[in-house]
Each structure stands twice: as C-alpha cells, then as structure tokens.
Amino acid sequence: MVKDEKELNIAILHPDLGIGGAERLIVDLALGLKSVGNNRITMYTSRHDPKRCFKETSNGELDVHVTGGYFPRHIFNRFMVICAIIRNLLAALYIIFFSGQKYDVIVLDQISASIPLFKLFTNSKVLFYCHFPDKLLTSRTSLIKRLYRIPIDLFEEFTTGCADQVLVNSNFTSSIYKQSFKHLKNSPSVLYPIINTNEFDKTKQSHNFSNQPIENNLINPIKLDDKKFFLSINRYERKKDLKLALDAFSVFISNSESGGSGKGKDEIYLVFAGGYDTGLKENVEHLQELKDKAKEYGLENRVIFLITINEEQKQWLLLNCCCLIYTPSFEHFGITPLEGMYAGKPVIAVNNGGPLETVVDGKTGYLCNPTVKDFANAFNKIINDPINSKKMGINGKQRVNDKFSFKPFAQNLNTIVKKL
C-alpha cells in the first residue's frame, strides 16, 4: 500500500494526447494527482500536437514526453489495433529501460497491452482506467474480422486483469466491464469524469451570441440572444438520436398550436450544436437528414443547426438555453448533462446509461423513455413550470459542485492511489 506521506513519482501513459473526452479525463487525472501533496507527474504519449491539445499539456503545466510514435498508426489503413498495441509497448519499454526514472505508480488508459511489462520489469503499482472495453467498440462485419479479433479480445482481458486496480467512468460501464471480462474476478472502482468548472466560470452571460463568428453555420440567420430555446449538443451522428429531439419538438409545438396547455411555444426554438466534419460522410448525410425533417415538419424557421462551435460559444449556449436535451441511449457516461447542470439548466435525458448516474429525475431534470411522447411531455413541463425548472437548474449546479467537480475528483483519486 502506498503511504500517505510519501511523495510519489507517477507516470501516465496515454496513446494520443489530442482533444477528446478520454484526453480531457486523463489530463484532469494528471492534474488531480499533481494537486495532492507534491507528487511528481510525467506524461508519456505516442502522439502530441501542441496545436491540437489541451493547453495544460503544452503550456508547461504538465510534463509531456513523446515516445513510440515512430511506429506507424496503421499499415495501408489496416491493422490499426495491432499498430496501437505495438506503439503502446514501445512507449512502455522506453519508460521502463530508457527514461532514467523509477516510478511508484504507472497510470494507463485505453490500451492495456503494456501492463504485464510494467508488472514484470518494475516494482510500480499499475492503475488502469477503462473508458469502455475495446472489444465492444469494434465492428465484426466479416468472418476474417471476427477471427482476427479473437486473440486480441483474449489479450485485452488478460492484460487488463494484470493491473493492480482498474477504474471505470460509471456504474453502467462497470456492469458492461463485468459482462465483457467474465474471467476477471476483481471488480473495477468508479471514478467519474468531471467538467472544467474554472474555464466555464470565465465565460460571462453578457457575451452576445449574435456577435460570435458562426453566422454561416445557421440554417436561418437569427439572433439567439433574445430567444428562448432548447439546446442539444452532440456530434451529428445517427447513434446520438438527434431525430428524437426534433420529433419531440415537433409534437410539442403541434400540441400548442392545436390548443394544448403549453404557453408561448411560438417563441421557442430548438438549437442543435455539435461536432461536424465535412470529411465524414455520416456527419454530412445526417445533418441534411435533420434539415429535411425540420422542413417536413414546417419548423425550418424554428430549428437551428450550428456546426463545430468553440468552447466560448458552447458555454454561451448553455448559459442562455432554457433546457439541455440529451438523447443518446446507453452512453458510457456522457459529460454534456454535467455541463448543462453546471450552467444552472434543467436536463432532459434518456433513462438509461450514464445519465442515470448524473441526472436526478424530478430534481435536476427529467429522465425519460427514449420516446417522442415522453420527451415532448418533458418539454412541456419545462415551459409550463418555469419556477420548478429554475429550481432544478440550481439543484443541478449544486450536484455538479458536490460530486462532479475537481475537488471531489482529486480526493477520490488520492484515496484510490493510497490503497494500491
């Protein structure tokens, strides 16, 4: 067991320190370990672009070393998993034999391949963060692919089981982990991801969205700063079920215009904002599908599509929407509901996966069956009871501060490391 008073020398190995949810978590994990005592943190990665990374990894706040990146990421666009494993092993060999350091703790995530090396050649305790079993993230559309994955899946289970402690991002992921790795007896511990509340606090509500340089991204140019709107933030992918929000919004508006009990729905908009890459066929196709559906419903003047917004724009939207809508089912965790809650907004989300652990039904928002009827009813509750909606927003921000902010994250992480 690691002693409380000891200053720890800790290495963190991550495949690609770019910009993404896994990268944000591993950076927060490094900052959390650094904030506890005087721990020395060194990050290793096979790829790090200073122009495309979180600033903490490029401004000197965290010590980052690139190693193993000389091996290709793929071979003629194939064997990506094998190449990732080899890059991981090469980075591990550098840490073990050439870094000149002896580490008390090694932290890895995403790729477990090198864990046996650290256990065999060092006295380090190994902590592995499993965002989600890799074996469940790959398609097996052909017999060759299925056969190819058999040894890789077995290797993943074996190497994951070599860690001294495994962490996952939610109880939902923990249950999937146990189903996927049936031969592993030790249960993982849950360490929830967090949001960067300090950065969020820097954005003021006084920012005028109409002055932001995104007017070309609007399906219909409109000033949002004086409008009431529901907000959905997700990538333009079909698995995110954005159509559910659009269908529910259509029913919500239709009920109002046919004499429903809703108030002022003629002034309400639905805003979709999310990642969009013209090089990704699905992004292009799905955005057009949603635009066509909005036109079919006669809502082209009430549904707004924004693409590839920056952090400041996203925070403005969160601070000024009336409610955040979260439609993906069986998400491993889902950070967006936390962002909505910290912005002081109620959240309408599906009643499965990660949101079951972040959103408290009736207190910080509404958890709904992923049906048009249930989501439309929740839309109606938000608009018809503004006092309760405001109260839920206040409750949500308090819940994030209590459970999903940096301080409890660092404290929980420190407790886990002490027990290694």
Curated annotation (Swiss-Prot):
Q: Pfam families from the entry?
A: Glyco_transf_4, Glycos_transf_1
Which locations, inside or outside the cell, does it occupy? Endoplasmic reticulum membrane
Q: Which GO terms describe its cellular component?
A: endomembrane system; endoplasmic reticulum membrane; lipid droplet
Protein's pathway: Protein modification; protein glycosylation
Q: Which UniProt keywords apply?
A: Endoplasmic reticulum, Glycosyltransferase, Membrane, Transferase, Transmembrane, Transmembrane helix
For this protein, the parts annotated as crossing the membrane are 79-99
Q: Does the keyword Lipid metabolism apply?
A: no
- Catalytic activity field: a beta-D-Man-(1->4)-beta-D-GlcNAc-(1->4)-alpha-D-GlcNAc-diphospho-di-trans,poly-cis-dolichol + GDP-alpha-D-mannose = an alpha-D-Man-(1->3)-beta-D-Man-(1->4)-beta-D-GlcNAc-(1->4)-alpha-D-GlcNAc-diphospho-di-trans,poly-cis-dolichol + GDP + H(+); an alpha-D-Man-(1->3)-beta-D-Man-(1->4)-beta-D-GlcNAc-(1->4)-alpha-D-GlcNAc-diphospho-di-trans,poly-cis-dolichol + GDP-alpha-D-mannose = an alpha-D-Man-(1->3)-[alpha-D-Man-(1->6)]-beta-D-Man-(1->4)-beta-D-GlcNAc-(1->4)-alpha-D-GlcNAc-diphospho-di-trans,poly-cis-dolichol + GDP + H(+)
Query: What InterPro entries does the record tag this protein with?
Result: ALG2, Glyco_trans_1, Glyco_trans_4-like_N
**Chain coiled-coil ranges:** none
Q: Where does it primarily localize?
A: endoplasmic reticulum
Any one Gene Ontology molecular-function term assigned to this protein's record = alpha-1,3-mannosyltransferase activity
What EC numbers are recorded for this enzyme? 2.4.1.132, 2.4.1.257
Q: State the annotated membrane topology for this chain.
A: Single-pass membrane protein
GO biological process, alphabetically ordered: dolichol-linked oligosaccharide biosynthetic process
| Function comment | Mannosylates Man(2)GlcNAc(2)-dolichol diphosphate and Man(1)GlcNAc(2)-dolichol diphosphate to form Man(3)GlcNAc(2)-dolichol diphosphate.
Q: Report the sequence similarity comment from the record.
A: Belongs to the glycosyltransferase group 1 family.
Q: Which PANTHER family match?
A: ALPHA-1,3/1,6-MANNOSYLTRANSFERASE ALG2, ALPHA-1,3_1,6-MANNOSYLTRANSFERASE ALG2
Q: Please state what the protein is called.
A: Alpha-1,3/1,6-mannosyltransferase ALG2
Q: What gene makes this protein?
A: alg2
